[in-house]
Amino acid sequence: LISLSLVPPALLVLIGLCSFLTGGRPRLSNAMGAAGATAASLLGLALTIAALLGPGAQSLSLPWNASVGASFSIGLDPLTCFFLLPIYGLSAVCAVFGFGYLGGMRNADTSGHGSGSQRTGSSWLFFCLLAASMALVVLARNAVLFLVAWEIMSLSSWLLVTHEHEKEEARQAGVTYLVATQIGTAFLIVMFLVLGAAGTASSPAASPIGPDQGAVLDFSRFAGSLGPGSTALPVAGAVFLLSLVGFGTKAGIVPLHVWLPEAHPAAPSHVSALMSGVMIKTGIYGILRVLTFLGAPEPWWGWTVLAVGAASGIIGVLFALAQHDIKRLLAYHSVENIGIICIGLGIGLLGVSYNEPVVAVLGFAGGLLHVINHAIFKGLLFLGAGAATHATGTRDMDRLGGLMRRMPLTGIAFLAGAAAISGLPPLNGFVSELLIFLGAFHGVSQGGIPQAVGGALAIGALGLIGGLAAACFTKAFGISFLGEPRTPEAAGAREAGAGLLIPMLVLAGACVAVGLLGPYALVLLAPLAAWMAGVQPESVAGLIEPARTGLESVTLAAAGLAVLAAALTLLRVLLQRGKEVSRAGTWDCGYGKPDARMQYSSSSFAQPLTGMFAGLLRTLRRWQPIHELFPSEAAFSTETPDVFARGIFHPLFRGAGSALSRLAWLQHGRLQLYVMYLAAALLVLLVWRLS
């Protein structure tokens, strides 16, 4: 199976190239890209499931003289297989959606830029490269191979973000994303150099320039390089912090998230779903993989991850509440859910540090299951937002409304995703959050003072995040899908076609299925959580049994209530069949003929909550002064830009740009001097290599 694991990424690259080469025939290119990407992803999903059911960890190493320390080493273990599941699964679903989405863009393209036709082939090339590189990131077992795959993933997603580069929004988002991802990569390079140096120090025979050079940067070398000892502790702590910053930039933890609410709205909706659903999770994978190199975690590692998770979750959902753009709102909710995952991982690390195996297993299990759950419901929500945007031409919620009547299946699917991300039973988001709650409660009730403090912090943060998320998606669904249409475009919306609906309904069904099968998901996930927690596999069943029983009881009760509600709804429909049913308006508060403008807007709905956190959000308000007693018109608008971007990163980037502009004299346009620069650089590298 380890050799076959390379087949799906290779097929994805081949399919992307074929779609690109047939770009002059957009219908063929679109069909080839969608069908090929779906088939290759489903093949990868099948092989991953077979690997999970098969023997233990497998590895393969091939000679690769790309650079010092490089080897083409890949591996399959439970952690790799776990992350391959959402990568391949969501890639297949998004590829199907992309077929209908890009086809509709091609048919509607009247811009003169060719965004719907000439770019179809390149869009599928970058999409397939993104899916293949994400798979290679989690398969890689060598630092050089990992970084190559990481850069391909970053650049292909950047090319997708800037695909409609004639738009200023896309260009600006692309610059922000590219700068952020390269900063993160710089930290990762330093981290791997530290690990490689530690590996060389622990085994001097492995010289970086000897015949064993590939082994120096192999992950197997890292795993034994930082064992117990006073000298290893500072190095392990430095590696942990470097990984948290480097991988956290990709994951979108606060305050390194600033690229995320810019890039996700600019990308096509199926790409936004893939980036938010699985690409940012490669950051979580990276942190977990590095933890396997470092041995027993220090307590402050768990506290750091828990604090970062709580801050990311709360700040992410607060900024989501203040947004008007539905895709920007969903992007901030990705920050929130990365925070929830980090809370679970932080609880797990604290459990390991303080020798509380139940806390550790439940924390890791909840965080890992939320990786899968977030991929499902966030993919669904981005696809639903894309279908609404496709039908109306706008992402502004204040220009939508009344879509439930016009797009009922899209509305039902979006509602399922909204309920799941809000953590409502019996859907999947509830299950993973409940596991983290159970781990935190166990720490409070059974652990010492540190576990109790950590558990209380997690419980408070999760409770606040859950309440704010429910309010935010009440706003998102209500403003967009309920009420009356606010614009002619919303009034003229039509239900999405089958190519857009089927992926959404599949993901909505997955939200329900994982929620109902939550106890079984815990049993399947427990061995991986136990491996991360350093718990013996034979003791796992006893550790999770109380949690499994409680989860089963809550899930069955919620499912029973859902079935009862469905039965009562069906009974109502049957009783009304064949009878005349009168319809009348609800209480209108004295306004017999309300105008669409009399509805809540997205900002007015959220104002009671955003007003409480005005000091953090710093919303900008613009209004037209009123001077007449009976004004004929008025205007009021709000905007909530990211305070971290505005207050920290934008000044930092401006300062760096100003400093670098002093080197502009090097860019003089004289070709012969550019050749001299290259020759000088090659000479320096040659001297360094020979020394």
Go through each PLM region and give its residues.
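Hydrophobic transmembrane alpha-helices and their helix-loop junctions in integral membrane proteins
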Residues: 93-107, 121-146, 156-495
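N-terminal signal-anchor/start-transfer transmembrane helix
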Residues: 7-25, 245-248, 252, 313
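Transmembrane helix-loop-helix hairpins at membrane boundaries of multipass inner-membrane proteins
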Residues: 1-6, 17-125, 199-231, 527, ...
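Aromatic-capped, Gly/Pro-kinked transmembrane alpha-helices
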Residues: 520-563, 571-691
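Hydrophobic alpha-helical transmembrane segments
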Residues: 73-88, 227-247, 450-466, 542-566
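Hydrophobic alpha-helical membrane-insertion segments
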Residues: 35-49, 182-194, 414-426, 503-524
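Hydrophobic core of alpha-helical transmembrane segments in multi-pass integral membrane proteins
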Residues: 13-17, 37-48, 91-92, 192, ...
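Transmembrane helix-loop junctions and nearby membrane-interface residues
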Residues: 20-24, 45-55, 92-102, 139-142, ...
